[in-house]
Regions:
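Conserved RecA-like ASCE P-loop NTPase motor core of nucleic-acid helicases/translocases
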Residues: 15, 41, 80-84, 152, ...
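Helicase-core coupling region on the C-terminal RecA-like lobe
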Residues: 81-161, 167, 172
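Well-ordered alpha-helical segments embedded in enzymatic catalytic cores
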Residues: 23-27, 58, 147-158, 189
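Short glycine-/polar-rich loops that comprise or flank the Walker A/P-loop
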Residues: 34-37, 43-45, 69, 73-79, ...
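Conserved helicase NTPase motor core
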Residues: 1-62, 81-91
Length: 190
C-alpha cells in the first residue's frame, strides 16, 4: 500500500522534523523507500513536543547519518546547514550561540553545538549602543512570583521610555509595546 501511495508523490517535504515521532518517521520511510525524495527540515534546539511523543533522537540520528553537502556523493542524501539568520540582530545571535555552545553536547541535547551548527548573521548589523540581550537572575521568595512580575513590569516601562531602540528594516526606531514578548514556561506562570 505504501508503495502505491508513494507513487503519487515526487517529493516528500517534512518541516519541524525534530518533533517527529517513531510512527510518523515510519510513514516517511515507507513513502520514500529506496528513493532520495525526502526533504526534512528541523532544528533540535526547537524540539518542544516531547509531551506529544516527539522524539528528537530521530532527528539527531538522521543529522549524524548524512554527510555534509560538500562531502556527499552524487545520489546520496546530504545534510545542508541553514545557519544564516536573517531575522535576528548580532547580539541575539551571539547570545544564542553562547548559550547553546555551553549547554549542548552529545550527552545533553544530543549533538555538539560547534562552529558548523552556530548561527551566522545574515543581515548587516546596526549598532544601537546598548546591550541587545540581558539576562537576570531573580530571587523569588514565594510561589506568587510577585517579585518577578514587578521586575518584568519595571523592565517593560524602561524599554518604553523612548530611550531604547529596535531595528526596523534598515532603520532604528523606539521600542513599542508590540515589540515586546514575554516567554513563560506554562500558562499557570501568568
Amino acid at each position: 500500500i505504501a508503495g502505491e501511495i508513494a507513487e503519487r508523490f515526487r517529493e516528500i517535504m517534512v518541516d519541524e522534523y525534530q518533533d517527529s515521532n517513531e510512527i510518523q518517521d515510519a510513514i516517511f520511510e515507507a513513502l520514500t523507500a529506496d528513493k532520495q525524495n525526502c526533504f526534512m527540515v528541523g532544528d533540535v534546539k526547537q524540539s518542544i513536543y516531547q509531551f506529544r511523543l516527539a522524539n528528537p533522537e530521530i532527528f539527531i540520528e538522521k543529522y549524524n547519518t548524512y554527510s555534509s553537502a560538500e562531502k556527499a556523493k552524487a545520489g546520496e542524501g546530504r545534510r545542508v546547514l541553514l545557519s544564516h539568520n536573517f531575522r535576528s540582530s548580532a547580539g541575539i545571535i551571539s547570545a544564542v550561540n553562547d548559550v547553546f555552545s555551553l549547554c549542548m553536547s552529545p550527552k545533553m541535547g544530543g549533538l555538539v553545538y560547534g562552529p558548523d551548527e552556530q548561527l551566522q548573521e545574515g543581515i548587516p548589523h546596526i549598532s544601537i549602543n546598548e546591550p541587545e540581550v540581558s539576562l537576570y537572575a531573580i530571587d523569588v521568595q514565594n510561589d506568587t512570583y510577585a517579585e518577578e512580575s514587578a521586575f518584568v513590569a519595571d523592565q517593560i516601562c524602561e524599554l518604553l521610555n523612548g530611550k531604547h531602540f529596535v531595528r526596523d528594516g534598515e532603520n532604528l526606531r523606539t521600542v513599542q509595546p508590540e515589540d515586546i514578548v514575554i516567554l513563560l514556561r506554562s500558562p499557570s506562570s501568568v
